Amino acid sequence: MEVDPQLRFLLKPILEWLDDPKTEEIAINRPGEAFVRQAGIFTKMPLPVSYDDLEDIAILAGALRKQDVGPRNPLCATELPGGERLQICLPPTVPSGTVSLTIRRPSSRVSGLKEVSSRYDASRWNQWQTRRKRQNQDDEAILQHFDNGDLEAFLHACVVSRLTMLLCGPTGSGKTTMSKTLISAIPPQERLITIEDTLELVIPHDNHVRLLYSKNGAGLGAVSAEHLLQASLRMRPDRILLGEMRDDAAWAYLSEVVSGHPGSISTIHGANPIQGFKKLFSLVKSSVQGASLEDRTLIDMLSTAIDVIIPFRAYEDVYEVGEIWLAADARRRGETIGDLLNQ
């Protein structure tokens, strides 16, 4: 692969990390800083590069694979000259003045089978039959706070246990405010990717990327929530947080959770868990992907995806948390989330 001399020059500030065999990932979320992942941990590092430098890296790296990268084509999955995989996100899919470059460094070494036990935690590999018992143990920890009526401890446990939470209520009911509160309880070392159509969420975590999709496919470089989800899965997220649920974002939400990224915190319109779930079901079913699924299949997917539905309402100057639907509570009653459709 012929390497542009300018690209080689622009990559100099990160060559030390790229050449280090301990490096697994380099995440550049904005000018001036990078997060380098080694031994499974991201460490924040200073990076003397400007916005223009990052944009040039993106354009030149895309050109290596004959991909036109820019405002009209702001997403690109490509490779660097050394074979490192690169996910590019440029404005308008990220806020103006920022660029997201996520570099995954391939391992140059192939491990033998005799190293499996030292490289992997395989303590549960033959424990399929005990998975229900483990589920019950996990449920008990959450249910203890639920049954004790300790809302603060319950919400904290939901967040740190990576339960997928759906907040429902009418406009102005406090659901977005609560989502910001819950996000602040996510452990600070986690890498967060948000997918929104407007910048509503507040993310206090250092290592985060804000991804933006266009409403109704309008605007320059218009991308869908589904496009952003596909990109985010190549960006080593600990959690993917979807903003308000609407249109094709609902399918992206479901795809995100079932792809192995639980712990999302999202909002949807609906006065109570029944209406909130029916709204989610309707949104997913109205998507191109959801329309091709049988109702039973879709309900089963949602049953594995949604752990908590929290309703909100406001009256006068009071914000109220209503009756929470909890999957663990439903399981002990012999119910599933699908039963909400029949109420």
Swiss-Prot record:
GO terms for molecular function: ATP binding; ATP hydrolysis activity. GO terms for biological process: secretion by the type IV secretion system. CDD domains: VirB11-like_ATPase. PROSITE patterns: T2SP_E (PS00662). Pfam families: T2SSE. The keyword Transmembrane does not apply. ATP binds at G169, P170, T171, G172, S173, G174, K175, T176. Its main location: cytoplasm. It is found in: Cytoplasm. GO terms for cellular component: cytoplasm; type IV secretion system complex. Autophosphorylated. The keyword Phosphoprotein applies. SUPFAM superfamilies: P-loop containing nucleoside triphosphate hydrolases. InterPro entries: P-loop_NTPase, T2SS/T4SS_dom, T4SS_GSP_E_ATPase, VirB11. Keywords: ATP-binding, Crown gall tumor, Cytoplasm, Nucleotide-binding, Phosphoprotein, Plasmid, Transport. Belongs to the GSP E family. Required for the transfer of T-DNA to plants. Couples energy, by means of ATP hydrolysis, to T-DNA transport. This is Protein VirB11.
